[in-house]
Amino acid sequence: MEAFLTALSGFSDPYLLGVVVLGTLGGVLVGAMPGLSSTMATALLLPFTLTMEPVAAIALLSALYCAGTFGGSITAILVNAPGAPPAAATAFDGYPLAQKGFAGKALGLAAVSSVIGGIFSVIVLIVAAPLLSRVAYNFGPPEYFALAVFGLSMLATISGESALKNLIGGAIGVLIATVGMDFTTGVERFTFGNWALSEGIHFIPVMIGLFAGAEFIKQSGKLDQKRFRVPLDAVMLPTYQDIKTCLSTIARSCGIGSFIGLLPAEGGTVAAMMGYNEAKRFAKDKSQFGKGDLRGIAGPEAANNAATGAAMVPTLALGIPGSATTAIILGALLVHGLRPGPHLFTEQPTLLYSIFLAMLIANFAFAAFGFIGAKVFARITLIPIEYLWPAVFILACVGSYALEQAMLDIWVMIIAGVLGFIMQRFGFSAAPIIMGLILGKLVEGTLKQSLIIFDHSWFGFLERPIVLIFLSLTLLSMSLPLISEMRARRRSAPES
């Protein structure tokens, strides 16, 4: 209770409150820009938080994370160009409704659904994270090794993506994590005689390159592309009848989003698609879906925002990212000298409550910005690409250099950007690479510690019940895509 009161009193400081509000405003703005995303913005902003106090830095990134998820719905509804991947499902019914002249109603419902989902997710975070951290007190290096392997295996289950491509992306991330000197044996790996690489490749320039650099190259080929948006008079609060129609959908999507968010490697995009599909499946009249059904907006918006707080649960309690953005927030914690896991809850309780409060404030703040400033955000989305993306690239270079004032980091960012762009062209996602990069170091470190504990015997893993549970879940998660593919082939066989 004392830690909560200390955290609460911290927000009476105009500086900390201003940081959260600024992060929220930036999140909505970035989320509303097609091509930009809260993940990219978090990666770009992370180096600039190094001079901040840990509480303010993590509160800023957490607020940006929450608000960016909602911000994507603005362009999804007005321009039919989702500002963030989780908002793609919102466009299915949001844009058709806006074309009918109800853009204000669509945005109002999106804001209300997002707030409900976001607050629900923060409650899940407050309740579940401490409970999970208590369980993690029983974890040693073998358990963390098995958990990290399970987290990597979850890449195969991400809905809508190729399981093989996700696993390849994760493997590339793990490979990048091995660059540098092995401090156990003193052997240099993949340094090619360059002493600057002996300490390894820092994950921040890689993150910036994969998200911002790759998107800069991609958008450079769209300089002549014009955007058009539907007219927007004012954002309107949904009526009682609108809420009544969508209430069960919102409640269901809150549960779906929170469950998806709790799973390592899953995120808002998966939750939004599932929220939309379930809203359509439970609807008695499905004829209006795709034509402007309110439930087609409420479902994905509640689900993707419900995933935000839930994705922070494994991030804070176990040190296993729940999504690409939480992987970057995890990186921010590490950069500030904070190790996520059970000890964080005993050693830094004020920081944790500050994160909870920041996310709670951000959810109310982005709704206010959505209602008051939607017309402004809608105009900003029409900024010409030739002005926007050079500025993003400059920020990427400055952010990468600011880390250690080394030109190597800028080159790493550029190479990562080229790699990310090439992989996008072949249908790969950047998120699995980030997950592999973050978890790769954990896998290697805990594996070596475990083998020392077991006197270099691999059979020692089989004597730990929790390890066996995680390894069984790993096999299951790896098998599910294969089973789904086999079922799909069997169904399509009679038709062909």
Q: What spans do the regions from the language model cover?
A:
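Transmembrane alpha-helix interface/packing and boundary motifs in multi-pass membrane proteins
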Residues: 24-38, 68-80, 155-160, 254-266, ...
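Membrane-embedded alpha-helical segments of transport systems
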Residues: 66-71, 112-124, 132, 176, ...
